[in-house]
Amino acid sequence: MPMLEPSALDQLFHAARTHNVWLDKPVDDELLHTLYDTVKYGPTAANSTPARFVFVKSAAAKERLIPCMSAGNQEKTRQAPVAVIVAYDTQFHEQLPKLFPHTDARSWYAGDQAKINAAALMNGSLQGGYLVLAARALGLDCGPMAGFDANKVNETFFPDGQWKVNFIMNIGYGDAEKLHPRNPRLSFEEACKIV
């Protein structure tokens, strides 16, 4: 596999920023389909792909979501073209006969809800990371958020309890003029070991 050009790494990582202010430019539904059709190929344990994505675009759906957000995240969510509820399916293992057919992977989880939830959260979080990178690769900016009332989101959007919110991410076309200076990151020596 060839190494990506530096410009591609810049778009995905080095020059990419978390956005909180958005241009008044819509995100087409077709692009959201392309986004998911890219994300779904990211690796997960046993191809479990437990993440579920709710693309909140309409004014009516936004008005349901905004009261679930913390005060500091309400206006940015209102302004963003799309707010994505990144959720996970607490019954993802029921899809394993289709997604991982060469062995009985469903039996690894059946009847153990704690194990199901842990695997769903871990692998769904991986997929949420893929969503960030795929969005950036497709020319979109992202603003992941943890400031929301998870119980309220679940009650509002997932009343049957099968899906659970993991985090929420605004996507669209960010206003680069409104970015703050970039915060520092830990060095290799601070964050890594080679053993």
UniProtKB/Swiss-Prot annotation:
The protein's UniProt keywords, in alphabetical order, are: Flavoprotein, FMN, NAD, NADP, Oxidoreductase
Cofactor names from the entry are: FMN
Q: Which CDD domains does UniProt cross-reference here?
A: RutE-like
The portions of this protein that span the membrane are none
UniProt keyword Signal, yes or no: no
Its EC number(s): 1.-.-.-
Per the UniProt record, one Pfam family is: Nitroreductase
What Gene Ontology molecular-function terms does this entry list?
A: oxidoreductase activity
What family does this belong to?
A: Belongs to the nitroreductase family. HadB/RutE subfamily.
Q: Which HAMAP family does the record match to this protein? A: Oxidoreductase_RutE_HadB
Protein name in the entry: Putative NADH dehydrogenase/NAD(P)H nitroreductase Rpic_0870
Instruction: Give the taxonomic lineage as stored in the record.
Output: Bacteria, Pseudomonadati, Pseudomonadota, Betaproteobacteria, Burkholderiales
